[in-house]
Design a protein with these regions (language model features):
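Proline-centered turn/helix-capping motifs that create local helix->coil transitions or kinks
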Residues: 99-108
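Conserved acidic
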Residues: 6, 43, 80-83, 87, ...
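Extreme N-terminal tail/first-helix region
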Residues: 1-13
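Short, contiguous alpha-helical
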Residues: 11-15, 19-22, 30-74, 113-169
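Helix-adjacent hinge/juxtasegments
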Residues: 60-94
Length: 169
């Protein structure tokens, strides 16, 4: 059947920015993708794990499914350079399947904020959404903004890691 045009646009934009982060890992080894520009900064593998976890969590909860997201574990960098691509593709398939269950009517419906984690957080969560009622569309647009922000973050981190840890040095 295919997605409604607005949902297809949302999917395309979200996946474009997720793919930008995944592409920042291309050609790098596990040491490079785990490198942090600052002790308190995020590595490339943390960025992709976190953005995919956040996007998937938002979309599946908007269609009423349970999420087992553990946001804190995203910052422990559980993926490797080799596993990242398959993890990203699996998450994109789950996101696409959930988006298929939305329509224009559900985009306009008010929705409670998606639960951030299945347990209390130790890594603080920051929301850029203003107070007041939010629609499913608001949360999807926030997911896109979040992915885009971290895509730029990942591209800068990739350039820094190449300078700090040249491959083969």
């Amino acid at each position: 059947m295919g997605l409604a045009p607005e949902l297809e646009s949302i999917r395309r934009r979200l996946f474009r920015d997720i793919d930008r982060i995944a592409e920042a890992l291309d050609g790098l080894d596990d040491e490079q993708i785990a490198w942090k520009p600052l002790a308190t900064g995020s590595s490339l593998i943390v960025l992709i794990t976190h953005v995919v976890g956040s996007a998937q969590n938002t979309v599946v909860q908007l269609v009423g499914d349970e999420s087992s997201r553990d946001r804190d574990s995203e910052f422990l960098a559980p993926w490797t350079a080799q596993s990242a691509r398959s993890e990203v593709e699996a998450a994109k398939a789950r996101i696409s399947a959930a988006l298929e269950r939305l329509d224009a009517r559900t985009l306009d419906a008010e929705h409670a904020p998606p639960r951030v984690s299945s347990r209390p957080l130790t890594v603080p969560s920051v929301s850029t959404l203003s107070a007041g009622p939010k629609t499913s569309r608001d949360f999807l647009l926030q997911a896109i903004a979040h992915a885009a922000e971290h895509a730029g973050h990942a591209e800068l981190t990739r350039d820094l890691v190449r300078a700090a840890l040249p491959k083969g040095s």
